[in-house]
C-alpha cells in the first residue's frame, strides 16, 4: 500500500483527529503520529508498517471522577474507591496493575486533566516494591498518598519497603489498596494479607462490599493512618471490586499540603529512619502509643458495625468482606430478608486488624456461642476471639473452622452449610424457617439436560484466539520431538497457559520475572540445557536484574525465551517500558534486546514475528545446540492479539461503513485434503480450530475445521508447514467495498477456475456404478 493510500485510510478511520503527520523512517517503517497517541512501531523488535495505540480508553469512567457534592456515582466498587481517593485529598497515587485492582490504575492513567486540576501526582510503578517505596513521601511530610497492587503476590514483592515504612511510621495518611485475590476467581497462590498486616503492624481494613461503606473506609483509612502514624491496608476481594452500586459523591479535594511544598521545604526526623537506636524506639512506639491510638480511633468512629437484634443466644462475627455472602446464606435459612434485616445479632469487622477487645466482649456477653466467619487459613481472628473471651472469663463458645472450610472461598452455599451446622448445635430453634426452594429434579432429569455433560466438553483455560504466544510453544514442541524433553521453568503471565494441554510445557513458576532465576540451580555440565520462559512485563518488573543479570553474572548456559507482546497483556493491556505505542505520559519503546545486551548478554536473537513457526523452531534449536557458553536469550515479539483486535476492529468497521475498500483475511481447511489425523490441533490448540464430521466414506475420522472466530493470524497454516503436516490449510482474502479492478479480477478467476473444472470433468473416467 502506498503512503498516500495509508494517509487517506487513517485520516478516514482515526476518530477525533484533525492533524495527521506521515513519514517514512530510516527503516522503511510507516510513521503515523496524531493527537490520539498513535505512532509507528519502531524497529525495537516488531514488524514494519504496523501501528499500535497506548492502553484502552477509560474516558467514560474518568467523567465519573468529576462528580461533585450531591451527585450520584454509579459503578463498580473499585471505581468508587478511586473516586474516594480524590475526595480524601490524596496527593499522589502509584501502584502496579493486576486483578482485581487494575481498573483503579487504568482510570487514573486516563484522568490526566482531573489529576492536574487537583495537583495529584500519578504514576504506574515499575513494581509493587517501587509503589510501596513511593509511600516514603508521607513519612516526613503531612502528605496523603495511596498505592495499590494485587495481593498476596504484590505484597510479597513490596515486603521490604512496607516493613521499613511501618517501622518508622508516617506523618501523612498512607493507604495501601490491596486486591485480595482469593477464591474461585483467583490467579495466584491462596494466602491472606492478614498475616503480613500482623507481622508488620499495619492496620487492615476489610470493608463491607457496598459502595457507601467502601468510600467511607477510604476516607476513614487516611484519618486512621494520620491519627496513629501507621500505614493502613484496605483489603478488597474480587467480588468487592466488581460489585455494582451507588453512593452520593462529594467534591474532590486538593491536597492540603502539596508535594511541591515538601520539595521546597525539606525536613527530616532521624527518629523515623530505621537505624539503631531509633529502630528499637520505633518497636516500642508501635505497642505503647500507636496500638492504643488505633483502638480508640476505631471505637470513636464506629468503624465496626452491628446489625440485627441487640440480644440473642447466638451471634455471628464476620470480616466485612464476608457480609454479603453471610446475609445471603441467612436469607436462604429464613433468618434475614432481602433488605438486610437479620434476626441473628451480627458484628461486622470492617477493621480486621487490630481487633477491639471491648467491642468483641460486649457482643459476646450473654451468648451461648458465636460463629466466626473468617475466609482463608490460618484462623487468626478465631484464635484471638478465644484469647479475648478467656482472659475476660466469658464462657461464650467460639465456632468457626469446625463448621466452615479451612480453605476456599466462602460462597453463599458454603456459608449456608456452615451456618446450618452451627445453629443445629447451638440454637436449633432458629432452624425450620427456610423458604421453599424450587425443585430442580424435573429439570435435571430431562434427557436434553443430561446430554449437556457429553456435548459440552470441559475446556481448560488457554491462549486467546490468534495469540502470538501459541506459535512459540508449538515451535517448542517441535524442538522437543527432535531433541528430547528439557527442564522448562515457567513464569507469571499469559504464557503460563503453556503448562496446560495441548502443550504441557513448564515445570515450575516461582514469581513474576523469576522464570530464568528459577532455573539457576541447573547451571551444571549436562548434555541438555534448561529452558526458561519470561514475559516482557515480568522482564521489566523483576527479570532484568534478578534473572538476566544473575544469569550473565554467573555464566549460566541455559536458554531464556522472553515473550514480548508489547503490553502487560495479562493484567489488561497496560503499557510497559518496551511498548511500541507513543505514550505522551511515559517513555516507551525501550528495547528489550538493548537492555539484555547492556547487562552483558552476548548470544541474543530476536524474532520479529512469532507466527513464523519455522524460524522460531530453528532459533530454539540453535540456542539449545550452540557451542557458545553463557546465557542464550531469545526475544520473541508480536503484538497481543486481544489488544490488536481492540485497536483494529473499530477502525475496520468504520472504514467499511464509510465505503472504503477494506481487506481482511480468514483461514480455512480444505475438506478434500484434510486427513483427519488432527496433528495440527495438537500442535496449535487454537479455540477456533475444531473438528467436524464429513460425509466422505473414505475417511473414518472427523476432519479439522476453522470456525467464524478466526482472526486470520495464520498460525495453523504455519504450524502445518513447519511440522510437515498435510497441506490442507488455505488463506482467503475478503475484500469489503471492492473496487472495479477487484470485481474484474474475481470474475476472471472464476472463469479460469470454471475452465479447469470443465477440463477435469471432460477427462474423468466414469464407471457404470457411478451415479454421475
PLM-predicted stretches and their roles:
Residues 33-35, 45-210, 239, 309-313, 499-633, 641-646, ...:
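Thiamine diphosphate
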Residues 660-670, 723-772:
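Intrinsic disorder at enzyme termini
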Residues 181-231, 237, 265-274, 278, ...:
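Conserved thiamine diphosphate
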Residues 104-107, 134-137, 157-161, 184-192, ...:
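Short acidic, glycine/serine/threonine-rich loops at helix termini
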Residues 115-124, 167-178, 262, 553-564, ...:
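A glycine-rich helix N-cap at a beta->alpha junction
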Residues 25-35, 46-78, 82, 208-469, ...:
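Flexible, low-complexity linker and terminal segments
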